[in-house]
Curated annotation (Swiss-Prot):
This is Biotin synthase. One of its GO terms (biological process) is biotin biosynthetic process. Gene3D superfamilies: Aldolase class I. Its EC number is 2.8.1.6. Keywords: 2Fe-2S, 4Fe-4S, Biotin biosynthesis, Iron, Iron-sulfur, Metal-binding, S-adenosyl-L-methionine, Transferase. The gene is bioB. Pathway: Cofactor biosynthesis; biotin biosynthesis; biotin from 7,8-diaminononanoate: step 2/2. Catalyzes the conversion of dethiobiotin (DTB) to biotin by the insertion of a sulfur atom into dethiobiotin via a radical-based mechanism. SUPFAM superfamilies: Radical SAM enzymes (SSF102114). Binds 1 [4Fe-4S] cluster. The cluster is coordinated with 3 cysteines and an exchangeable S-adenosyl-L-methionine. Binds 1 [2Fe-2S] cluster. The cluster is coordinated with 3 cysteines and 1 arginine. PANTHER family: BIOTIN SYNTHASE, BIOTIN SYNTHASE, MITOCHONDRIAL. CDD domains: Radical_SAM. Residues 53-282 form the Radical SAM core domain. [2Fe-2S] cluster binds at residues 115, 147, 207, 277.
Length: 332
């Protein structure tokens, strides 16, 4: 049951964070449970933190889906899962040439980070070599930072990706540990944490976030932010469930735009120095309040996602310019 809370001084809480005072879990929950009428005040406070560490810069990232569908995992949210009946394109690995071409498209879209993503539980050594070949050519011909998201890794694979010049590895926690078995049965929450740690141990910057709106409680939503703090994720993608028809979660109620804003603000308060990225579901869930999200977040994807469409890059550039913000190109 939602408790009645006295109104907090959100700006004071923000200045405490800037002075390197960690907020309590109760404060994070209070942000999520605040009245909707307080959301602009909360976002204003979140911007104090965001501006202190990142100024007016916005980082752009672009995804390429190098292998679509055909995944043996049963993640309930995912249209690429073996149990999904969603009508998506399914294809095996793109050629190295296509992956490299995507990097140059990322530059045209003013992205600084290029994310090479493949469906599946884990890559084979042959598949890792395929990615490494493309990564080396991209590193030789561009200044892009490269992120990979290929599934579970072993130590040797993580080390070889690092040696090839991969800057960042994405492996999301997805949801709270207590909620994980409701979302997936083919692997565990701890499996995901293990891969994040392997990437970090190999010298790759860890990228890990969550998909909000998958049945987690408000308290669990806050605890996810603290867990991401604990594993020291450098980049935190905040995804909002898009209840895709044909997936087990197709009937799940999606978060409202205001709920999404509260999540972004809460994540900024808990992880003040980290890259907070508005990721999957941005256009669908935040809708007309997308620009407000950038008062907490400092990063977005530009273009399409894995199996859902994003808005035109020109719309994102215009949104950033209209806010008085600046695109940070070719920066991790």
């Amino acid at each position: 049951m939602k408790q009645v809370q006295t109104k907090r001084d959100w700006k004071k809480l923000a200045y405490d964070v800037v002075e390197e005072k960690m907020i309590a879990k109760e404060d994070a929950i209070a942000i999520l449970e605040a009245e909707d009428t307080e959301v602009l005040e909360i976002m204003n406070a979140a911007y104090i933190i965001r501006h202190h560490y990142f100024g007016k810069k916005v980082k752009l990232n672009m995804i390429i889906n190098t292998k679509s569908g055909l995944c043996p995992e049963d993640c309930g949210y995912c249209s690429q899962s073996i149990i999904s009946e969603a009508p998506i394109d399914k294809y095996a690995w793109l050629t190295q040439e296509k992956i490299v071409e995507g990097a140059h498209e990322a530059i045209r879209r003013k992205a600084g980070t290029y994310c090479i993503v493949a469906s599946g539980r884990r890559p084979t050594d042959k598949e890792v070599n395929h990615v490494i070949g493309a990564v080396k050519e991209i590193r030789e011909t561009t200044d892009l930072k490269i992120c990979c998201c290929l599934g579970f890794l072993n130590e040797d694979q993580a080390g070889r990706l690092a040696e090839a010049g991969v800057h960042r590895y994405n492996h999301n926690l997805n949801t709270h540990a207590n909620n994980y078995e409701n979302i997936c049965s083919t692997h565990t929450y701890d499996d995901r944490v293990d891969t994040v740690q392997k990437a970090k141990q190999a010298g790759i910057s860890p990228c890990s976030g969550a998909i909000f709106g998958m049945g987690e409680t408000i308290e669990e939503r806050a605890e996810i932010a603290f867990e991401l703090q604990r594993i020291d994720a450098d980049s935190i993608p905040c995804n909002f469930l898009v209840a895709v028809k044909g997936t087990p979660l197709e009937g799940q109620k999606e978060l409202t735009p205001v709920e999404c804003l509260k999540v972004l603000a809460m994540m900024r308060f808990v992880n003040p120095t980290k890259e907070i990225r508005i990721s999957g579901g941005r256009e669908i869930n935040l809708r007309s309040v997308q620009p407000i999200g950038l008062f907490a977040a400092n990063s977005i994807f530009v273009g399409d996602y894995l199996t859902t469409a994003g808005q035109e890059p020109t719309a994102d550039w215009g949104m950033i310019e209209d806010l008085g913000f600046e695109i940070e190109e070719c920066a991790l």
